């Protein structure tokens, strides 16, 4: 097992205190799950699993869900936890692309599903893998990414209907875009990564900068964007499909639309995995099995109250079992992901290379400097056409694509050492980790100062 080594993380480690679940009732088994999923998803899966587990084993199980925030924060929390040597979490459930990074860091315990369960899961959907070839993770659900928009606001203001990601960069949408913080939300980070790859790094980064400049505000949670759109606070924003669908079924949802930019988006599977050192490994494996069986997969797609479906909440997600998309399945999918062509433009290796650094770069460039960026963009817009000179200065990235990948490897990858390292080896690893963290902090400070000066030149 690999452990992260590093100092200067006391605050993060202290945040772990009290994160474990309560003591289980006498005779009950326990399961501790880290998940960025909503309360509705947690409640439905917990209740259904408890029923299934009781039938399978004759035993009760108590499930606890420590609050870990979004998937980006969940990954950081796990890094801190393994650094401290605390193996007190059993399962990671949800979070998207962070599972490949967790596998590389040695956080995941391989678990091969029973043959009948594994045989029902395709290896890919639209070219994207649905499970790890070494069985370290399984895609528990499928998602797509697009734009949620308020039809009434767009009509009242005479705005162009959004069809591609570039709509968020249009000056006509100044102050009407809702954006998310990629350092806090993995689905927001994924949406921004899709934009970078769909248009190419330079143009994609320009779209992200102009989107941020148009933003009314940055939301901490990806689910805040569709809620703000339904309230009429924003006109458009990036959104994962099931957040959009659930909001459209809620109050104010009749005014909402959702579009997946044609040829400019990609499917994403939302994995589940057993964590290394899981104290309740047998129960953890049963939970993964349940989620991947039809009994778990139906919860995503059946309406509340339907036999085998959720009890109270419509989860509105796409299952990974093709059998649930048939005419006799009783489900109501918005689309069939197994009928979509592969997204040939998407390179998972590029995503992985900047998985850690991209959220921090965008946080510094767009979120923490949002006000000077917004004022600079407003000044450019007021000057009228042509916008190109001011825009070029505004959107030019500080890092090339190659530089970002290199820094991602050299500075944004935590120092790791194998268990059993000698005291001298541990001390050396700690020294390197401290140096890495100092360099990371220095780079972020330099980026912030450079970009702030650049933005201020324009207003």
Task: Give names to the regions the model predicted.
Residues 22-101, 226:
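Early extracytoplasmic/lumenal segment of secretory-pathway proteins
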Residues 83, 87-91, 109-151, 166, ...:
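A structural signal for short loop-to-beta-strand junctions that line the ligand-binding cleft
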Residues 102-111, 133, 247-260:
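Ligand-binding "clamshell"
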Residues 120-121, 207-212, 252-278, 322-325:
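Periplasmic-binding protein-like
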Residues 148-153, 267-281, 299-300:
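A bilobed periplasmic-binding-protein/Venus flytrap-type ligand-binding module shared by bacterial periplasmic
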Residues 194-258, 298:
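Ligand-binding pocket segment of bilobal, Venus flytrap-like solute-binding proteins
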Residues 275, 280-284, 288-346:
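Mature extracytoplasmic/periplasmic domains
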Residues 376, 380-459:
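C-terminal non-catalytic accessory extensions
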């Amino acid at each position: 097992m690999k452990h992260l080594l590093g100092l200067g993380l006391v605050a993060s480690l202290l945040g772990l205190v009290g994160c474990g679940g309560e003591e289980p009732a006498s005779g009950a088994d326990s399961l501790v799950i880290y998940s960025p999923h909503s309360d509705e998803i947690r409640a439905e899966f917990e209740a259904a699993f408890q029923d299934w587990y009781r039938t399978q084993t004759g035993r009760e199980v108590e499930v606890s869900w420590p609050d870990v925030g979004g998937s980006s924060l969940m990954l950081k929390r796990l890094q801190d936890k393994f650094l401290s040597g605390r193996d007190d979490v059993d399962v990671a459930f949800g979070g998207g692309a962070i599972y490949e990074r967790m596998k590389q860091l040695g956080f995941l315990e391989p678990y091969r599903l029973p043959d009948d369960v594994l045989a029902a899961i395709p290896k890919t959907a639209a070219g994207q893998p649905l499970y790890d070839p070494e069985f370290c993770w399984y895609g528990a659900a499928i998602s797509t990414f697009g734009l949620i928009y308020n039809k009434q606001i767009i009509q009242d203001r005479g705005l162009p209907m959004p069809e591609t990601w570039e709509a968020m960069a249009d000056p006509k949408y100044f102050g009407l875009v809702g954006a998310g913080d990629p350092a806090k939300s993995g689905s927001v980070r994924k949406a921004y990564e899709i934009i970078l790859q769909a248009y190419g790094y330079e143009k994609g980064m320009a779209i992200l900068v102009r989107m941020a400049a148009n933003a009314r505000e940055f939301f901490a949670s990806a689910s805040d964007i569709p809620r703000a759109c339904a309230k009429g606070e924003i006109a458009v924003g990036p959104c994962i499909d099931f957040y959009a669908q659930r909001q459209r079924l809620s109050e104010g949802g009749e005014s909402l639309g959702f579009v997946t930019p044609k040829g400019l988006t990609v499917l994403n599977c939302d994995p589940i995995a057993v964590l290394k050192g899981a104290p309740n490994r047998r129960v953890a494996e049963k939970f993964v099995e349940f989620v991947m069986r039809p009994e778990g997969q139906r919860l995503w797609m059946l309406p509340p109250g339907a036999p085998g479906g959720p009890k109270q909440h419509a989860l509105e997600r796409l299952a990974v079992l093709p059998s649930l998309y048939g005419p006799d399945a009783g489900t109501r999918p918005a689309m069939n992901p197994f009928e979509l062509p592969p997204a040939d433009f998407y390179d998972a290796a590029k995503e992985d290379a900047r998985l850690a650094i991209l959220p921090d770069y965008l946080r510094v460039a767009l979120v923490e400097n949002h006000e000077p960026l917004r004022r600079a963009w407003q000044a450019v817009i007021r000057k009228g056409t042509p916008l190109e000179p001011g825009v070029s200065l505004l959107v030019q990235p500080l890092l090339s694509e190659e530089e970002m990948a290199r820094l991602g490897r050299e500075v944004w990858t935590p120092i790791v050492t194998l268990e059993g390292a000698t005291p001298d080896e541990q001390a050396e690893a700690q020294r390197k980790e401290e140096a890495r963290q100092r360099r990371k902090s220095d780079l972020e400070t330099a980026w912030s100062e450079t970009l702030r000066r650049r933005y201020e030149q324009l207003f």
